[in-house]
Amino acid sequence: MRVRKLSDCYKNLSNKNYPIFLLGDAKDILKNIEDNSVDFIITSPPYDNLRDYKGFCFNFEEIAIEIFRILKNGGVMVWIVGDSVINGSESLSSFKQAIYFKEIGFKIHDTMIYQKNNFSNPSKTRYHQIFEYMFVISKGNPKTFNPLIDRKNIYAGYTSLGENTTRKRDGSFTKQKKRVIKEFGMRYNIWKGNTSGQENMCKSIKHPATFPLWLAKDHIKSWSNEGDIVLDPFMGSGTTAVACKELNRKFIGCDIEASYLEFAKERIK
């Protein structure tokens, strides 16, 4: 498996051999991908000054426009991002990016939270920061949603309490039958779990900011189907690639740092 260079042309993605690893700047690489060709995007971009990316920075607005162009109608992107504290104030870069996505035509389908089980860089003047935003952004209405039914109901086995009603268009109500509460319900939009640092306590993931495999897999399962094309424009150490291999998705990833791509290739062997 080779790391392919920007000079390669990526048209007609349905006929390619996957996974595809692309070396170069995301804004340049995405311009070589055809319109309306990607089913799902998940990524955690370098934000503010929190990540050492070998001195590189990225042009958010150009990349956002290219993402809108290449994502299929009904496609979804999960944009995992946080904010740094600059001169005593949070940057709010995450919200500025979400607003820009909406301005160029996306829908902000959901604002989810990734709550970590641990924290780093504790502050003496504010509570420990243990979450990142996960903006679920769609091009039109999402065409795919496979909800994860793994939240344990504390009232499982009981008959639903009270009398449920459905309001009709004319304002009247229709009574609904009582039901037995199932053991598991749909997950909430705050996802709590181990960070990749905890997952890989005894491993060496050669990247400054990986997100955990379970997080990538759960989003891929939720917003795409087997055989779909999944893109990570800031793939880093290749966690999304590993998830796609395990879940039978067609992966495309790019990164500006060659060492990250080489390490990602090793992870999926």
Map each language-model feature to its residues.
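Core catalytic lobe of class I
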Residues: 1-263
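PRPP-dependent phosphoribosyltransferase catalytic core
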Residues: 266-269
